[in-house]
UniProtKB/Swiss-Prot annotation:
It is found in: Cytoplasm. It comes from Legionella pneumophila. Its main location: cytoplasm. GO terms for molecular function: ATP binding; metal ion binding; protein folding chaperone; protein-folding chaperone binding; unfolded protein binding. PANTHER family: 10 KDA HEAT SHOCK PROTEIN, CO-CHAPERONIN GROES. The gene is groES. This is Co-chaperonin GroES. Heptamer of 7 subunits arranged in a ring. Interacts with the chaperonin GroEL.
Amino acid sequence: MKIRPLHDRVVVRRMEEERTTAGGIVIPDSATEKPMRGEIIAVGAGKVLENGDVRALAVKVGDVVLFGKYSGTEVKVDGKELVVMREDDIMGVIEK
């Protein structure tokens, strides 16, 4: 099954955070928070403006983005946990 977001929504797959500190201490799953960065795997057509025009999104598939801890709606597709959110919930793109 594939999910196609509508309008200005994007689908993000969370990226795993480091589970070991710089000093070598392993952080258990119970002490870690959900990662607030992820890779965009699908984007909608764009934001519909008041005059009816459609503005293309500033992000694209493959971008790694930062987003708020409580952004979007979590969904499960084919056993994978994904987050569907509006482009406005994205704080920035991580450039390599």
